[in-house]
Regions:
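A short, structured loop/turn motif at beta-sheet edges
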Residues: 21-22, 74-79, 101-111
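Hydrophobic/aromatic beta-strand elements that line small-molecule binding cavities or substrate pockets
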Residues: 13-15, 69-75, 96-104
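Residue-level preference for beta-strand/loop junctions
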Residues: 7-9, 65, 94, 108
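Glycine-rich portal/gate segments that line the openings of hydrophobic small-molecule binding cavities
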Residues: 16, 45-91, 111, 147-151
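Hydrophobic ligand-binding cavity/cleft-lining segments
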Residues: 1-50
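Beta-strand/loop substructures that line and gate deep hydrophobic ligand-binding cavities in soluble
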Residues: 88-140
Length: 151
């Protein structure tokens, strides 16, 4: 087993995007849009009509390996913050969290921060993938999101 004492269990990346926070948030809060900007190249598709609006909602996503994930919304502030815990269908989340935070710089620019927190991950089978989720992969998602939002 790998010693995780030197591996950060909370990683993040951030940058300014030349778009309004509300426009960027729509791309994040609508799961059907997520495969377009996923820097991990892990998301294949999500059914339309799952736009997230509050804590407690669950949206389904299919991975590129054909697995379905149910994502449980645990943080939500319209236009500013959204976070979810992925899980196998009809299972409790194993404890890793994806968070997006948007801070308007002005009406046309937004600081976007993307965080992956696996400090409470209990599923040992997921540890290798968690360790492989680096700030560079999170930055890739932000950069792809920026290309869409600024396009």
């Amino acid at each position: 087993m790998t010693d995780d004492s030197e591996v950060p269990r909370i990683v993040s990346a951030s940058r300014e995007i030349a778009a309004a926070a509300d426009e960027i948030f729509e791309l994040i809060a609508d799961p059907a849009q997520q495969p377009r900007w996923d820097g991990n190249d892990n998301l294949a598709e999500a059914p339309a009509g799952q736009r997230v609006r509050k804590v407690g909602e669950v949206f389904a996503m299919t991975t590129t390996k054909g697995h379905i994930r149910e994502n449980h919304i645990v943080e939500f502030e319209e236009g500013r913050r959204i976070a979810w815990l992925p899980a196998e269908p009809a299972s409790e989340p194993p404890g890793h969290l994806w968070r997006w935070e948007l801070e308007p710089v002005d009406a046309a620019r937004t600081r976007v921060t993307h965080t992956y927190d696996w400090s409470r991950l209990t599923d040992e089978n997921r540890l290798p993938r968690a360790r492989a989720t680096t700030p560079a992969k999170l930055q890739a998602s932000i950069d792809r999101l920026a290309a869409i939002a600024e396009g």
